[in-house]
Amino acid sequence: MLKISVWHGDLSDSYLKKVTQLGVDCLDFGGGGYFPGVKEQGYPDLDALLKIKKKLSSYGLEINRVTLPDLTEKFIQGRKGGDKELANSCQALRVFGEAGLPIARQRFAGDTFPQQMRRYASSHRGGYRSRGETLARPQAAIPSPEELEKWWERFALAYSQLVPIAEESGVKLAIHPSDTPNVETPLGGLGYHRVIDAFPSRSVGYLYCCGTRAEAGGSSLVLDELHNYGRKGRILMVHLRNVRGSLATAGAFEEVLLDDGDLNPFKILLELKRVGFSGCINPDHIPAIEGDGPLVEQGLAYSVGYLKALLAALATL
């Protein structure tokens, strides 16, 4: 059964009531330092985590995905303190397992090349606002092949320690593609598939982001990858946002509301159904509609409602 997840927001009673009223099933926690305990000891406090889980349960909500403490440049460059970062991530994964949480993501510094892009606020139908990016001119330098291979070695070192813990604890490790997916980004294309080749454990899979991959090559790439990864049972959850343009076709892209871009969201859901995916779909980056504040609650309500309508239509097939 396909479910809908959204960001955790501020976890206030007001926010939790709103997402419950919208029919949301689960919450996703995207920040590696969000949970109590991370700042103090480097990893989440189990008791505090269980209290959050209990509060969400009182609204009929579950935790779908959490994020491990970040692995920063200290770890990627092999500098002092990097080993401690990995040890904290390993302990955090154990804590998430004890709390009975299903999916965890590990973030890695250096998986994107922000120096190659210029970000701006794009304006769309009626003036709603969203993220836009275009290739910077002139193009900045990117890491050398040797530096990129060194990045992969550090990634593999981290996963070689995290995967056995994931297997023991029952938590799935989900990797997100490089966003923005510039050429040669470590998780921007071929490198993304390399993860499951190197770590074939069934505890390893993808947080597949339709918007990010569309930025790389449009809707045909998204549908092909969903089929490829989905038939292998490697899609753990999905980010579903819509975009216009791509780096391949326009050297730029702009995020838009779900009905307002190049992707056909219903075709995406249909492909997910065909490959047997049964996890959560998160509308991901929410454009700001007139009157929206920091939590973009009106844009969120629109996105959740749109997804629920698509899922209702899908259920009739």
Predicted feature locations:
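Short, flexible loop/turn elements at secondary-structure junctions
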Residues: 8-10, 33, 110, 177-181, ...
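Structural motif corresponding to the early beta-alpha repeats
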Residues: 31-156, 168, 212, 273
